[in-house]
Amino acid sequence: MSRQMWLDTSALLEAISEYVVRCNGDTFSGLTTGDFNALSNMFTQLSVSSAGYVSDPRVPLQTMSNMFVSFITSTDRCGYMLRKTWFNSDTKPTVSDDFITTYIRPRLQVPMSDTVRQLNNLSLQPSAKPKLYERQNAIMKGLDIPYSEPIEPCKLFRSVAGQTGNIPMMGILATPPAAQQQPFFVAERRRILFGIRSNAAIPAGAYQFVVPAWASVLSVTGAYVYFTNSFFGTTIAGVTATATAADAATTFTVPTDANNLPVQTDSRLSFSLGGGNINLELGVAKTGFCVAIEGEFTILANRSQAYYTLNSITQTPTSIDDFDVSDFLTTFLSQLRACGQYEIFSDAMDQLTNSLITNYMDPPAIPAGLAFTSPWFRFSERARTILALQNVDLNIRKLIVRHLWVITSLIAVFGRYYRPN
């Protein structure tokens, strides 16, 4: 294949990438007859000559798509596409491929890629407002101010290594304690409960409770604070909820408020749980105790990860916008699953991505600390992983993401017609 044909290929992929970005993912139906005019007009504006599937509607889209999938999954055939010199007009490749020679037509104008590759611009975001999907909203919608709406503390409870989950704690707390002074910190609807279970008397004095991470992003307004022995309607064993009027007062302080806040009164309290520990001064000896904070809980301003990242606080962080590529790939992914090629293609794309990154390194190698936790079709997450490589020059990171974006765009367009024989 000639150098000019590879440059034409690069320019056409730039055009396809632009086409994918500008389309609405909800209405795009593939390269049908209705799409030919829009794509042809854009090619004309970009000074790109017509390609086979645009100028000749008789070209079987299914055959073309099948050839492309074979092309992109064959490392020996698409190896040159992964080299950074793919965008270099001074390099003359010595490779050939049926897909390129059959469906990509050469043109005589100055390749668009020669201009674009010098801009060093990611140009990845298709619109000013990221697109939201309902399934990713969880408790709160990504664009809502997170501290404007009440939230149930039991929905925030996060289990970590060595810690029992919130609901499993119900059975544990109902079982008589086997030892003295077993602290706990749990949550239910409209209430946070903390205290110490014991099978013997606990003397009056100062006790400290570490606020777990899930509760440290909360503030409460109009709260009653009192002793209780109930958790989700189940009696907590090893605590005393009874009190008399003659008992010395029990108070507590939080890091954000130096005042002593009373327990077991009609006072309505408002305070923040962020900043560290709750210090409680027990006024009278008890055989274990449990303090309930019952009120309206909200997320602390600027403390929720959702405030900055628009990620749900109840699930693993996910990108809410994938530059619309995910919508285009839905049909292709369905076909891969239907024919049992999903894992095969995923492995090929992982190998392709690693090979691409390796080719940009000097000397060629996978950068230290690079590990993808998302599938190949979650482009924005992979782009974020690549852009986070601080030990790689920023311009190189940009070029890698742009290069991978072009390849993903090509898959998004041609993959819609993939029908394995």
UniProtKB/Swiss-Prot annotation:
Example GO molecular function term?
host cell surface receptor binding
Q: Which Gene3D superfamilies match?
A: 2.60.120.170
Q: Which domain of life is it from?
A: Viruses
| Gene Ontology biological-process entries | fusion of virus membrane with host plasma membrane; symbiont entry into host cell
Q: Name one GO cellular component term.
A: viral envelope
Q: Which UniProt keywords apply?
A: Capsid protein, Host cytoplasm, Host-virus interaction, Outer capsid protein, Virion
Question: InterPro entries attached here?
Answer: Capsid_hemagglutn, Phytoreo_P8, Virus_capsid_a-hlx_vir
Looking at the UniProt entry, the stretches that span the membrane are none
Q: Is Nucleotide-binding there in the keyword field?
A: no
Q: How does it assemble?
A: Homotrimer. Homomultimer. Interacts with host peroxisomal glycolate oxidase (GOX). This interaction mediates its relocation to virus factories peripheral to host peroxisomes.
What is the protein's known function?
Capsid protein which self-assembles to form the outer icosahedral capsid with a T=13 symmetry, about 70 nm in diameter and consisting of 780 molecules capsid proteins.
Hey, which family's this protein in?
A: Belongs to the phytoreovirus outer capsid protein P8 family.
What protein name does the entry list? Outer capsid protein P8
Q: Which organism is it from?
A: Rice dwarf virus (isolate S)
Gene name, per UniProt, is: S8
